[in-house]
């Protein structure tokens, strides 16, 4: 049971890192983008990710595990670095920023689904993870709808 608990804590910590990286990515995107409507959405998405990380930390505590300090997940850090590079070279180009956010959300969705589908993750954890996944999917749909509105 101990090894399973460590495994679960590791997986939840991975989601915490993804949520924190998403928060940071959206804050960076909000700073760079000029469209006030999109900026407001990005700030709301950043706030959502802060809440997600906090909720996931509670799960880690309930499992008597230790939440990792901010370090970034492998998928999330790649997104964060890419966001930094993109904004530097694009000078705040809205399309490039939005496309980077789409890429980050698609990567987050993939990782959340892997954790949800993992039989080692306790059923008691899955409703919250599923709810967060739904929020990420809604954010992605919102971003994509903005792209389609511009066309």
Name each model feature, range by range.
Residues 2-34, 96-120:
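Alpha-helical bundle segments that constitute or directly flank the non-heme di-iron/ferroxidase center
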Residues 8-15, 36-54, 97-100, 124-136:
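Alpha-helical scaffold segments that form or flank carboxylate-/histidine-based iron centers
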Residues 15, 22, 29, 52, ...:
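Amphipathic alpha-helices that form helix-helix packing interfaces
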Residues 26-33, 60-63, 89, 116-119, ...:
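Secondary-structure edge/capping motif, primarily at the C-terminal ends of alpha-helices
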Residues 39-75, 146-150:
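Conserved alpha-helical segments that form or flank metal/cofactor-binding pockets of metalloenzymes
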Residues 58-96, 100-103, 107-109:
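Carboxylate-rich helix-loop segments that flank metal/cofactor sites and access channels
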Residues 97, 101-151:
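Preference for long, well-ordered alpha-helical segments
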């Amino acid at each position: 049971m101990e090894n399973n608990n460590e495994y679960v804590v590791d997986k939840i910590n991975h989601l915490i890192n993804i949520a924190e990286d998403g928060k940071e990515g959206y804050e960076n995107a909000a700073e760079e983008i000029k469209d006030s409507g999109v900026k407001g959405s990005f700030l709301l998405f950043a706030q959502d990710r802060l809440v997600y990380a906090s909720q996931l930390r509670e799960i880690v505590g309930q499992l008597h595990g230790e939440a990792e300090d901010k370090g970034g997940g492998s998928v999330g850090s790649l997104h964060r670095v890419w966001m930094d590079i993109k904004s530097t070279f694009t000078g705040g180009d809205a399309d490039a920023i939005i496309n980077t956010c789409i890429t980050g959300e698609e990567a987050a969705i993939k990782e959340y689904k892997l954790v949800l589908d993992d039989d080692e993750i306790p059923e008691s954890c899955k409703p919250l993870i599923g709810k967060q996944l739904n929020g990420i999917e809604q954010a992605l749909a919102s971003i994509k709808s903005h792209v389609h509105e511009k066309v």
